[in-house]
Amino acid sequence: MTATPAQRRPALPATRPYPARHGPKGSYLRKMVTTTDPKDLGVLYLVSATGFFLIGGLLALLMRGELARPGLQFLSAEQYNQLFTMHGTIMLLFYATPVVFGFANAVLPLQIGAPDVAFPRLNAFSYWLYLFGATMATAGFLTPGGAADFGWTAYTPLSLSEHSPGVGADLWILGLAVSGLGTILGAVNMITTVVCLRAPGMTMFRMPIFTWNILITSILVLLAFPILTAALMALAYDRHLGGHIYDPANGGAILYQHLFWFFGHPEVYIIALPFFGIISEVIPVFSRKPIFGYTALVYATLAIAALSMAVWAHHMYATGAVLLPFFSMMTFLIAVPTGVKFFNWIGTMWKGQITFETPMLFAIGFIVTFLLGGLSGVILASPPLDWHVTDSYFVVAHFHYVLFGTIVFATFAGIYFWFPKLTGRFMDERLGRLHFWTTFLGFHLTFLVQHWLGNEGMPRRYADYLPSDGFTGLNTVSTIGSFLLGISMVTFVWNGFKSFRYGEVVTVDDPWGAGNSLEWATTCPPPRHNFYELPRIRSERPAFELHYPHMAERMRAEAHAGRRAGHGAGAELSVPSTVATKDDDHTS
């Protein structure tokens, strides 16, 4: 593998100190509140999700502060329960899921050459449902009894009215139902947009990998989220109308766990697959190569989605009420298509002319972290090993490596990657590198040691421990790492604010110089309906062909897929050069 140092582009003058204001003061706010433009809604999703991410991170810092030393107890046990309940809920359902739709709204219509999404007003309605539901659930902290305190899984009978009588629990249930409805409607919109609004020439196997992953994720949303909504409505019915749905005689706790995890495990892939797609967009651009194994990546994504519906009960090994061999085998099997993706990402970088701009740094951080999380997942997939570490900090470390490693690293890769496209300005590269290294080091310092804590027997969800337990040293290290992680977010927020106002102005359609998909064939930022003119779409790399038409024949000859000339997605590249270069003088 060869690597070349990142070449700093010549500084461009900031021709304006701040994006020009059109209309009277306050008109921008009014525009964002009433908008149906998917790019604006994407920004709203991303900003709102980042806000909830900061709230969830603050809750995590309070928990880590509590656990830094034994006997501190600046939080009561009840407050600690509320913190870990809302931390998990916010991070998974109010940050990770909506940030998927933020990227989907901002980028997917551009990538398929569509002027808008299929249902613009429904799209806006979906966002406001999410924001209203998330605010409702989080508002439990303002009630006299505090927020929900039964864990983000809300297992019965703990979540029934006898054990959790507060208003905060009801707000949590209804907030998740409302927010989940917004997610379902957003998925319907994305599926319809991909099926109905692709540009001429944009066949399914010419779509970018990110678009494929959003399509498959949206199908998973339609399969999983209605189950969560039904389970929550049944829980509300039990709490207030005496439904007895979760009584032991009718299935009880095991029935609820099956319903919840039939949603819960597909949810893990609902919030993972889109970020796999982001990484699949970032790596080729900064490796200066086409994606290795495009078709294999698509089929691997389909395989992961299918298998994700068949592994939910591996969360229930400890109950003894599930068929262990089947669910263990399915869990091991899901590692195969995931391994295919790793093979393709590494194959894309192999012998590439790699440059290490901030998006690429976060993409590599994603690969390293997610790989380590997957290795601990192999341990947990085996029931005999899982029984020894279940409900310990080993499990906490595993799912943070998998989820943080996937969602947060890929989120930042996507933001740094598409920020110039959406705003017309670059983010600060030095602050970006500082952000990456503080995030990477802070994360691994926080969660690597938690594997050892779990192996030594520290249970999760405990608000305190004894000095004689021997957990003090590793907990102190973990807390130091968590505060370093918190500092990294200050860097990111300042970078985003500073770059939006004063960042280096983008003057070209493709600021990274090697963009493949259609969003790099329009202006930065794009016009209201995305394109002034669409280039011809002959393969899965239309923007690259537009900007480098003289490379068409070589790209066909060196295609990884080894298609025969005249067949497959790259066949049109063999047309006479007079046709292939017809759009040479095209400008977007």
From Swiss-Prot:
<feature type="transmembrane region" description="Helical">
    <location>
        <begin position="43"/>
        <end position="63"/>
    </location>
</feature>
<feature type="transmembrane region" description="Helical">
    <location>
        <begin position="320"/>
        <end position="340"/>
    </location>
</feature>
<feature type="binding site">
    <location>
        <position position="314"/>
    </location>
    <ligand>
        <name>Cu cation</name>
    </ligand>
</feature>
<keyword id="KW-1278">Translocase</keyword>
<feature type="binding site" description="axial binding residue">
    <location>
        <position position="400"/>
    </location>
    <ligand>
        <name>Fe(II)-heme a</name>
    </ligand>
</feature>
<keyword id="KW-1003">Cell membrane</keyword>
<feature type="region of interest" description="Disordered">
    <location>
        <begin position="557"/>
        <end position="588"/>
    </location>
</feature>
<dbReference type="Pfam" id="PF00115">
    <property type="entry name" value="COX1"/>
</dbReference>
<keyword id="KW-0186">Copper</keyword>
<feature type="transmembrane region" description="Helical">
    <location>
        <begin position="291"/>
        <end position="311"/>
    </location>
</feature>
<feature type="transmembrane region" description="Helical">
    <location>
        <begin position="477"/>
        <end position="497"/>
    </location>
</feature>
<keyword id="KW-0679">Respiratory chain</keyword>
<dbReference type="GO" id="GO:0046872">
    <property type="term" value="F:metal ion binding"/>
</dbReference>
<dbReference type="InterPro" id="IPR023616">
    <property type="entry name" value="Cyt_c_oxase-like_su1_dom"/>
</dbReference>
<feature type="transmembrane region" description="Helical">
    <location>
        <begin position="128"/>
        <end position="148"/>
    </location>
</feature>
<dbReference type="GO" id="GO:0006119">
    <property type="term" value="P:oxidative phosphorylation"/>
</dbReference>
<feature type="binding site">
    <location>
        <position position="265"/>
    </location>
    <ligand>
        <name>Cu cation</name>
    </ligand>
</feature>
<feature type="binding site">
    <location>
        <position position="269"/>
    </location>
    <ligand>
        <name>Cu cation</name>
    </ligand>
</feature>
<keyword id="KW-0813">Transport</keyword>
<comment type="pathway">
    <text>Energy metabolism; oxidative phosphorylation.</text>
</comment>
<feature type="cross-link" description="1'-histidyl-3'-tyrosine (His-Tyr)">
    <location>
        <begin position="265"/>
        <end position="269"/>
    </location>
</feature>
<feature type="binding site" description="axial binding residue">
    <location>
        <position position="398"/>
    </location>
    <ligand>
        <name>heme a3</name>
    </ligand>
</feature>
<feature type="transmembrane region" description="Helical">
    <location>
        <begin position="90"/>
        <end position="110"/>
    </location>
</feature>
<dbReference type="InterPro" id="IPR000883">
    <property type="entry name" value="Cyt_C_Oxase_1"/>
</dbReference>
<keyword id="KW-0408">Iron</keyword>
<comment type="function">
    <text>Cytochrome c oxidase is the component of the respiratory chain that catalyzes the reduction of oxygen to water. Subunits 1-3 form the functional core of the enzyme complex. CO I is the catalytic subunit of the enzyme. Electrons originating in cytochrome c are transferred via the copper A center of subunit 2 and heme A of subunit 1 to the bimetallic center formed by heme A3 and copper B.</text>
</comment>
<feature type="binding site">
    <location>
        <position position="315"/>
    </location>
    <ligand>
        <name>Cu cation</name>
    </ligand>
</feature>
<dbReference type="InterPro" id="IPR014241">
    <property type="entry name" value="Cyt_c_oxidase_su1_bac"/>
</dbReference>
<dbReference type="GO" id="GO:0020037">
    <property type="term" value="F:heme binding"/>
</dbReference>
<keyword id="KW-1133">Transmembrane helix</keyword>
<keyword id="KW-0472">Membrane</keyword>
<dbReference type="InterPro" id="IPR023615">
    <property type="entry name" value="Cyt_c_Oxase_su1_BS"/>
</dbReference>
<dbReference type="InterPro" id="IPR036927">
    <property type="entry name" value="Cyt_c_oxase-like_su1_sf"/>
</dbReference>
<comment type="subunit">
    <text>Associates with subunits II, III and IV to form cytochrome c oxidase.</text>
</comment>
<keyword id="KW-0249">Electron transport</keyword>
<feature type="region of interest" description="Disordered">
    <location>
        <begin position="1"/>
        <end position="26"/>
    </location>
</feature>
<dbReference type="GO" id="GO:0015990">
    <property type="term" value="P:electron transport coupled proton transport"/>
</dbReference>
<dbReference type="GO" id="GO:0004129">
    <property type="term" value="F:cytochrome-c oxidase activity"/>
</dbReference>
<feature type="transmembrane region" description="Helical">
    <location>
        <begin position="214"/>
        <end position="234"/>
    </location>
</feature>
<keyword id="KW-0479">Metal-binding</keyword>
<keyword id="KW-0812">Transmembrane</keyword>
<feature type="transmembrane region" description="Helical">
    <location>
        <begin position="399"/>
        <end position="419"/>
    </location>
</feature>
